[in-house]
């Protein structure tokens, strides 16, 4: 039986009037909303243990305060966080990310500290007298407008911030030949059956063949040849192209992009072949640099399993293991039975569990060569539209218990360089739909962990669309050198 988490590590005196306390805290959360928005427009992103507060309602902010109990043993109160946010709002800071949750917990655990002096010292290197931005924001182009292309569009628009560091300038796609092509593309971006309504406004500009997305004019360019796209006509220079088509995966094919004089580099949203670097942000992104002309962000499954494997190998040393991915269907499968060149995939995706192969084991060996020959993998496609599950069964060198494995992942999720990559769940009722639009590469399910001496099985959920797209954007920001510094530093 898995030991349940005790949420009452840090005790507080109970309030006499629960409703009165709630209304007080709700009012403070409501006051936070405009402050968070104002800071965002200045390039400052406010977080609560890694979760962004931007575009959150007052109730969502209160839920994020409650979430902190999963990390620290008790929730935070808006009474504790509001003064910190208010002080930050009065400071003149360079663009950065500030986790007010981590700041407040540090203050609560070190009551001798003067809060104003601590915050001032913590953010000292970010103080400025005037803004320092590049003369021109870096241009980004998305090549392809399918599932990943549209989700990337949503993320890039939402992360634009002050708009001084980078901008999504264009989307390149094949011309459907339909008179209302642009209107239909806007409709697909505006409403998504899995991820819901777009959080903002989308206007169609037929004259310029562009969409105005939350104030960002994004040109739609029709082409089927990367070398011949006339980016110059749209004043696009030294662009980074994100190729989400999957049509070209080797150096010869992807180099078509960089042969275009307006393109500086290309980032592939699929596993790259040959000598192309496959990068999983948080694990081997140190091998990616602004000098690379072609990079690949590997696959959604690779991004989900590699951080978990590295963490276990670093702490317990993997002898061997097997990975079974329970993967939501994709548009590569057939809605009803029909011909498909791959075995079994011709059968209806909506009606069957489909056993299929996966390149996950080979991908692991590319990124973690120390595990070459130690890992096998297979996949089962299931009739759900989104969110997948990696079941990782491993033999490790020494005996290890469930609590030790869980604590290893908990620390990684909240206080390591993997905190942007790994999420941690304590829920005893978690199911796949709970993780729609989850921002992390994987969510470690602590309640499902099994250990039998040196045999360990862990379960990792992952949004194979949104979580993966977030990883792509993290890698993009790294190679563009526009990642925001995060405070307080670990």
Task: Name every feature range the model reports, one short phrase each.
Residues 2-62, 315-453:
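C-terminal substrate-binding/catalytic lobe of Rossmann-fold NAD(P)-dependent dehydrogenases
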Residues 2-334, 342, 474-475, 482, ...:
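N-terminal Rossmann-like NAD(P) cofactor-binding subdomain of oxidoreductases
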Residues 303, 399-400, 466-467:
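A generic structural signal for alpha-helix starts
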Residues 381-385, 461-468:
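Glycine-rich phosphate/pyrophosphate-binding beta-alpha loops
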Residues 452-453, 464-466, 476:
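A generic transmembrane alpha-helix motif of multi-pass inner-membrane proteins
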């Amino acid at each position: 039986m898995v030991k349940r988490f005790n949420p009452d590590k840090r005790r507080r005196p109970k309030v006499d009037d629960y409703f009165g306390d709630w209304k007080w805290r709700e009012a403070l959360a409501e006051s936070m909303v405009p402050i968070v928005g104002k800071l965002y427009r200045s390039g400052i992103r406010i977080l609560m243990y890694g979760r962004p507060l931007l575009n959150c309602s007052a109730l969502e902010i209160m839920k994020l305060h409650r979430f902190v109990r999963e990390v620290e043993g008790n929730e935070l109160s808006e009474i504790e966080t509001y003064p910190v946010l208010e002080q930050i709002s009065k400071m003149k800071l360079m663009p950065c990310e500030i986790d007010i949750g981590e700041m407040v917990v540090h203050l609560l655990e070190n009551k001798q500290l003067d809060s104003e002096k601590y915050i001032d010292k913590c953010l000292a290197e970010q103080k400025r007298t005037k803004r320092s931005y590049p003369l021109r924001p870096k241009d980004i182009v998305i090549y392809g407008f399918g599932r990943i292309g549209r989700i990337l569009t949503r993320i890039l628009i939402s992360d634009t911030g002050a708009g001084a560091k980078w901008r999504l300038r264009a989307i390149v796609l094949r011309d459907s030949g339909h008179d209302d092509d642009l209107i239909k593309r806007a409709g697909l971006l505006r409403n998504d059956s899995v991820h819901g309504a777009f959080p903002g406004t989308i206007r169609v500009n037929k004259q310029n063949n562009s969409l105005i997305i939350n104030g960002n004019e994004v040109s739609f360019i029709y082409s089927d040849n990367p070398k011949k796209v006339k980016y110059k006509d749209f004043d696009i220079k030294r662009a980074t192209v994100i190729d989400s088509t999957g049509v070209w995966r080797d150096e010869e094919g992807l180099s078509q992009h960089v042969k275009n004089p307006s393109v500086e580099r290309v980032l592939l949203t699929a596993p790259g072949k040959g000598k192309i670097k496959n990068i999983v942000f948080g694990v081997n992104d140190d091998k990616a640099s602004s000098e690379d002309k072609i990079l690949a962000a590997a696959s959604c499954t690779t991004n989900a399993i590699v951080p978990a494997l590295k963490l276990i190998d670093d702490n317990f040393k993997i002898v061997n293991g097997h990975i079974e991915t329970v993967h939501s269907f994709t548009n590569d499968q057939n809605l009803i039975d029909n011909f498909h060149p791959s075995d079994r995939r011709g059968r209806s995706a909506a009606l069957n569990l489909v056993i299929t192969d996966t390149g996950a084991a080979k991908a692991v060996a590319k990124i973690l060569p120390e595990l070459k020959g130690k890992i096998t993998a297979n996949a089962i496609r299931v009739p759900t539209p989104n969110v997948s599950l990696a079941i990782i069964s491993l033999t490790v060198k020494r005996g290890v218990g469930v609590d030790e494995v869980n604590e290893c992942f908990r620390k990684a999720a909240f206080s390591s360089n993997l905190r942007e990559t790994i999420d941690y769940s304590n829920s005893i009722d978690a199911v796949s739909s709970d993780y729609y639009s989850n921002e992390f590469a994987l969510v470690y399910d602590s309640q499902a962990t099994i250990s039998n001496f040196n045999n360990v099985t862990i379960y990792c959920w992952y949004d194979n669309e949104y979580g993966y797209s977030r990883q792509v954007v993290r890698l993009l920001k790294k190679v563009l050198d526009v990642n925001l510094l995060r405070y307080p530093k670990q």
